[in-house]
Each structure stands twice: as C-alpha cells, then as structure tokens.
Regions:
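Non-catalytic terminal accessory segments
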Residues: 1-125
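Soluble catalytic domains of enzymes that build or remodel membrane lipids, polysaccharides, and related
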Residues: 141-399
Length: 399
C-alpha cells in the first residue's frame, strides 16, 4: 500500500497549493465577508474532492472493491478538471494586472481542460500499433521474419466498456497475424473476478500461431486487496492464472519455454511479479533482487526473449544471461507523454531511468510497452494505448 500512501501525499500537496492560489485569487475581489467565505468554502470543497475520496478509499474502507477504485479514478479526474486546470488563470491573474496576460492565462486553463477531456474521451481508447524490427546474429535463420506481438497492462477493472474495448483490441491484434503473443502483466486492476464471462469470451478471441505467453504483474497478485478473509490473495491469484489458462494462454512462472522451427529453437522466459518486488516496484535500483535461479537450465547459446513486468529488472537480467530481447510494461509512461520535436517528455522520467519504447546496450534490447489500460485517472495524454509488433531479423541471413 506504500504507493497509494505516497500518492495521497503528492495529491494532498497539490490540493493545498491549489487552495492557497484560490484563496489569494478570491482576495482580489471586493465582496462581503460572508460571500467571500462562501466562495472559499466552495473552492475548498472542489480542491479537496479527491483528497477526501482517497483517504476514505485507502484508510477507511474494509476493501477496495472495483466500484470504489472506479470512484477514486474519476474523483481524481474531477480534481484535475475542476482544480488543477484552473491554476494557469489564477497565477496570471495574481501576478499581472494586464488584461492580455490574464486573458492568456484563461485561454491556457481552457486548453488544459480540453486536453484532459480529449485524453479521457479520445486518446484513452485510441490504440496505436508500433512496429519494431530487432536484428540479431544470434537469431536462427528459421526464425527470420518471426513476428511477436506484445500487449501489456489491460487493467480490465478500470475499463468503461471492457467487452467492447477488448474485442476491438483482439480484432486489431489478430489482423496483424503474429506468430506469438506476449502479455507482460496487469490483466486485472484489483482482483480476478473482473474477468466476467463476456470478458473471458472476448479475451479468447486473441490468436497466435505459436500461442500466447503471459506473466503476472503487481495488480495480478492482488496486493491491493484489503479483505483477505473471503478470498485470500493466493486464491485470487490462483483463479486468475486458471482463467488465463482457460483462454489458452501459457502463464510463465519464473520458467522458460521453447518455440521450435525445424531443428532450431528460441527461448521464452517469464518472470513472475512477486510480493518481494512490491515495495520497490517504482525504484530505479533493484540490484538487490536475486534472479540467479531464473536461467539455471536455459542454454546461453539459445536466442532468448524474457518477459518482465517491471523494466527496472533489465540490468539484473542482462548481468545473468545473454538475453536478447526483454519485454516489459508497468510504467504506462504515467499516461502522459508529450512529443517535443524528436523528444518525448513524461513525468515518468522523474522516477524511471527507462520508461517507454526501445533501449539497447551491446546488442541486447529492452522494450517498454505503454500499456492499454489506466490507473489513477481515466485518461491518456500523448501516451496512446499501445500494441507493439516486433519482427525479428536474422543478421546472418540478411548478409
């Protein structure tokens, strides 16, 4: 629960700043004291809307059932629209008497509201397919042009119309005709029973010639459930794994499987997100995490693709094994990524060394998928929900 407690403090600080600016703003107007108090009270209610909800959610509720999680997400969105978006106008009004500068502040606030609404209504489900080519002299020639599709972070419990959204995602994925699909964790947001029968049927639509391989993410292992009496976290996770197996997915639990072409093979290794990773899942340094047993029986000469929900484990992985391609998710680019020229700017840059897209070191590659779903607020700005299609190329064959 540490993540949530930290987030509450960040949002509380933001609300206090917003309330302070609102208070200064109201002081600029001539009005009766009673009317001034009413305005300040109204703005205080708006500015503290999410804070009250968050504290009720995380501190008072016996459990974080899906409806409470949804209320929390939408309350945060309301806070951003009603409180944060107002602040450009407040600041310009306080620092200048020039009507043009104040007008620019008002326009900025209107633009921010528009961006937030567009991120919720449009970008949230505006799926993008990113094509990535990986060339290696370690790839067997029989796997030249092999196509791997990556999905990550569906967070089904937060979807507004999950059956419709998943059916659309499955249709896009199937049209790409992948040889294999890799799912890198966080299928659900809170618990396994988000997988209603209609949603299970929608997920079963996903098809790939060599099957679908998946791993568990932090939301999949039920770390956000408080009430463990009715159904323990272990049992929730067991049922989630059983559901994925029912779809025909192969859940990799710190193990390696092989895909064969003629006499050649490539290895698919999956790292299960564990309780021991929970407290450090947003840390940039996970050097203390021990993965020594992960590749103990995996031949180093075999081309290897490793699935890891959190990208921070890449350094641990590559120090142990000549892993050729590591696929990760988790970060979502914090659902905000603004493109400026050739650069993408995101708040996730403050927390993560590697946060989105392709990274390479000494012919080893890491790809961080921006995910499909969302957490904390129901919108995406710039960071569109992503489906990634990899095409593997044999360097020796290319010659």
């Amino acid at each position: 629960m540490q993540k949530h407690n930290n987030m509450i403090w960040v949002i509380t600080f933001s609300a206090i700043i917003a309330l302070w600016l609102d208070y200064l703003f109201i002081q600029h107007f001539t009005m009766s004291e009673s009317k001034r108090c009413k305005w300040i009270l109204l703005l205080a209610i708006i500015d503290s809307l999410f804070i009250a909800d968050a504290h009720l959610f995380y501190l008072l509720s016996p459990d974080n059932i899906s409806i409470i999680s949804d209320i929390s997400n939408w309350a945060m969105f309301a806070f951003m629209i009603l409180a944060l978006a107002r602040q450009p106008f407040n600041v310009t009004y306080l620092i200048s008497r020039n009507k043009w500068i104040r007008g620019c502040g008002a326009i900025c606030s209107i633009i921010v509201v528009g961006i937030f609404l567009h991120g919720m209504a449009i970008t949230r489900t505006n799926y993008v397919v990113n094509n990535v080519t990986i060339t290696s002299d370690r790839l067997p020639a029989s796997f030249d042009n092999y196509r791997i599709l990556q999905l990550s972070d569906l967070h089904i419990g937060t979807m507004i119309a999950p059956e419709t959204e998943i059916s659309e995602i499955a249709s896009i994925c199937n049209s790409l005709q992948p040889d294999m699909i890799a799912f890198t964790g966080d299928l659900v947001d809170t618990r396994y029973n988000e997988l209603q029968p209609s949603i299970k049927e929608a997920l079963k639509q996903l098809k790939a010639k060599d099957g679908i391989y998946s791993i568990l993410g932090n939301h999949d292992i039920v770390v956000y459930i408080r009430d463990s009496i009715r159904l323990t976290p272990k049992e929730n996770t067991r049922r989630l794994i059983a559901a994925e197996q029912e779809f025909g997915w192969q859940v990799l639990d710190n193990q390696t499987e092989y895909i064969h072409r003629e006499a050649d093979s490539i290895a698919i290794t999956g790292i299960t997100f564990s309780q021991t990773l929970q407290e450090d899942r947003h840390s940039s340094d996970l050097s203390q995490v021990n993965l020594e047993d992960l590749y103990i029986n995996t031949p180093k000469e075999c081309y290897n693709i490793t699935l890891s929900h959190i990208p921070q484990l890449w350094s641990n992985i590559t120090s142990l094994h000549p892993t050729d391609l590591t696929l990760a998710g988790h970060v979502h680019a914090m659902q905000i990524a603004i493109k400026v020229g050739q650069w993408r700017i995101s708040p996730s840059m403050l927390l993560y060394k590697r946060w989105s897209g392709l990274y390479s070191e000494q012919d080893k590659y890491l790809y961080i998928n921006d995910g499909i779903g969302y957490t904390l607020y129901p919108m995406r700005i710039g960071a569109r929900p992503e489906i990634t299609l990899f095409e593997l190329k044999c360097k020796n064959k290319a010659k």
